Amino acid sequence: MSDIIDDFQKDVTINMQKCIDNFKININKIHVGRISPDILSFIKIEYYGVITPLCQLTNTVVEQPRTLIITVFDSSMIKFIEKAILESNLGCTPVSTGNTIRVTFPTLTESRRYSLIKMVRSESEKSKVLIRNIRRVSNDKLKTFLRNKEINKDNEHYFQNEIQNLTDIWIKKIILITKEKELELMKF
């Protein structure tokens, strides 16, 4: 029984950690005053039938605080890369010249900052819902364990409390990360 429960607890923790990791990745796409090539790291392009990360098809450097220069290795991919950047909802403008693409990001106005904060809060809520869904699925598994007599009623109650504690901890982390990102957005 203890092996089942140990594996179960590890799975719950791992799933909640993955949720937090994805949340961090998603809000790191939301840029503040400084731009880095990492802001494009999630963009993928179909290259000869294979979905390929942008970083494998290009070399990206920072030209100015709001401008990236992307050197494309295969010039036939320029239009596809421009399209992928435009569709990424980063609010930037790609302009190609030769085998390079210049990507300019807008300055952060107050209204743009507030819209970015709304995006961060939206991602935060999505992540909280995912954490709660993990809790719900986990509690359902506990009920199945109880029905199959793999655990008793006391163990079920104990592990439900443990799962609730984990849920509270991970949601607090999401709230903390959200507040940090909001402060970062308002600072620049």
Swiss-Prot record:
UniProt xrefs under HAMAP family: RRF
Name under which the protein is recorded: Ribosome-recycling factor
Similarity comment: family membership: Belongs to the RRF family.
One annotated GO molecular function: ribosomal large subunit binding
One CC-aspect GO term: cytosol
Gene3D superfamilies: 3.30.1360.40, Ribosome-recycling factor (1.10.132.20)
Keyword Protein biosynthesis among UniProt keywords: yes
Protein source organism: Blochmanniella floridana
GO biological process, one term: cytoplasmic translational termination
InterPro entries documented for this protein: Ribosome_recyc_fac, Ribosome_recyc_fac_dom, RRF_sf
Domain of life (superkingdom): Bacteria
Keywords: Cytoplasm, Protein biosynthesis
Function of the protein: Responsible for the release of ribosomes from messenger RNA at the termination of protein biosynthesis. May increase the efficiency of translation by recycling ribosomes from one round of translation to another.
Compartment list: Cytoplasm
Main localisation: cytoplasm
A Pfam family hit: RRF
PANTHER family, alphabetized: MITOCHONDRIAL RIBOSOME RECYCLING FACTOR PSEUDO 1, RIBOSOME RECYCLING FACTOR
